[in-house]
Amino acid sequence: MSGFFEELKRRKVYRVAIAYIVAGWALAQGLAQVLPVFDISNSVIRVVIALLLIGFPVALVLAWVFDFTPQGIKATPSIASGSHRRRNIFMLLATGIVISAATGFFLLPRAAARKIDKSIAVLPFENLSDEKENAYFADGIQDDILTNLSKIGDLKVISRTSVMSYRGKTPNVREIGKMLGVSTILEGSVRRAGNRVRVNVQLIDATNDQHVWANDYDRDLTDVFAIQTDLAQKIANELQAKLSPTEKAQIENKPTQNGEAYLAFIQARNLFAPEEFDKLKQAEQLYDRALQLDGNFALAAAYYSQMEAWIYRNFDKQPERAQKGRALAQRALQLQPDLPEAHWALGYWYYYGDLNYDAALKEFEIAQRGLPNNADAYLAIGAIQRRQGKWVESNASLEKAVSLNPKDTWPMQNLGQNYAMQRNFAAANRTYDRALAIDPNAFGIKELKAKDAIAEKGDFSLAQEFLAKADTIPDLSADIKNHLAEGRIQVLVFLRKFDEAAREATKVPDDALTRYPNALCGKYITIGLAKKRSGDEASARQFFENARGFAEKDIQQRPNDASAHANLAGALAWLGQKEAALAEVKRAQELMPESKDAFDGPQITEALAQIYAIFGDAASAVPILEGLLQRPSQVTVPFLKLNPVWDSIRTDPQFQALIDKYGAKA
């Protein structure tokens, strides 16, 4: 054997082997850096490695047989006998094969199985235009790139809301990647001058802050969609994401050929502010302009329809608006039947307009398949699933929405509500705390956390702290002030400070509650209860009559609204009209049975129990309450102990047994 190793040394096989390994490794590393620049798949690297491994034993044999001399390549003279020479060549070949096989066994599977983290966040693009009002255009480019990427099911794409906090900041890419849970960051800038657009982008590896590639695009305004398409395809290729034919077609689709229509569209989309009706009305004008300039602009019609659905739900329930919004959704679908955003828009009209949750879910699921990375699609699906009583599925959908939008508190707020309805207050509080770590001033989160502290433990400290601090916040909108007053009144009623509650209710002018008929009716019932507690039955009755009048007027405008009938039932009950009150609340149940809506339906069921309780009918109220305590609802033992509406049956043995039974479980 020592003779074999001496021969290896004499024939310089060691030197060739080392040189081959070093050169092969350098070649593989160089290809790994260069190939992505030319959009060549990493699978080429694996092929090169395989060829190098196959070539290794061949190189050893050639090094054994031949030698490089000043006179050229010559056969190396052998000093061994024929049998020893054949044995040595066989041993050399076997050694080379074993080394290559062992290396390939460990290296190739890892190269093949190396899982690329196919996750990306697109940071806000910097506006380099001379006209700073063109910032909306940079936002529009970023938003459209995000939308294109969100159509690729093999990617994980973080939603726009979660990246907007990085606008105008010098990014620490590693920190952002860690915060958002992504491995790749796209950042860029936009400069617009007239109809010319220049877009500069850099794709960065968030794990090491290394630039993967950069590109500049200089195009006409009408060609901006080609930039977005090219970027989406390059990013998909870099992250080894598979593009289905449908996804490829969606990405390559140009929503409009009209540059002015596109500008109006992205301005309108950028104006969407859920709580600011004035901005929404400005956006309406811009959407109208976009569709006037291009009547075939399906995407604009779809977004316009979605916004109209939101306005209809929250600000203006006029039938004309519903007709307009539905027509826009249908128009978008006629123009482009496979447009995910059009199905999304139609889904919202089934949801907000018809309360047809099955039809809404069908449309949302179509939209989600076309926008597999859109957090709002999962949020909408989760909202429908909980109304269908599919709580496990709803939790999963909302968790997915949170993962795609990790710095937006709205999905977390919805997820926390789910957990609270299921009385999993520990999970609800973890979700709220996660949201407050992102936004310590998140109004809705603080409110829910305070409410849940009462629901779980009867603890008012968070609510009182929240309400006290809210009073010091400057420039609160009238709507938020009224909402705070409603919460303050509820706390005072639970604390049995009825006179204070009545004074608080009196401070809120009626015209401030015209869009909130439930609150308007509740205002007069609260004042009536305070008068009743003080022994002023005549005044109490007058306030209950006022509440009744508001509820009846509301029913005239919303005859199929369950909450309107429940409000009327409450007013009638306090007026002593038991049969009429039961008729109204049962009508509310017909309109919103729990079998149709497992999220809001339990509130109507609880209203029925309250009507029975007002008349001292524990035998009818307690079984209803027990059912609500056994399934997701807002009913908890602390709420039953605190709410004065149960006072008429509070000492009844059946009610006390219910409190004891479920209080022990809690």
Task: Give short role names for the model-derived ranges.
Residues 518-522, 561-571, 597-613, 638:
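Amphipathic alpha-helical protein-interaction segments enriched in hydrophobic
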Residues 570-574, 655:
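C-terminal substrate/ligand-recognition segments
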Residues 1-108, 210:
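An N-terminal, helix-rich hydrophobic module
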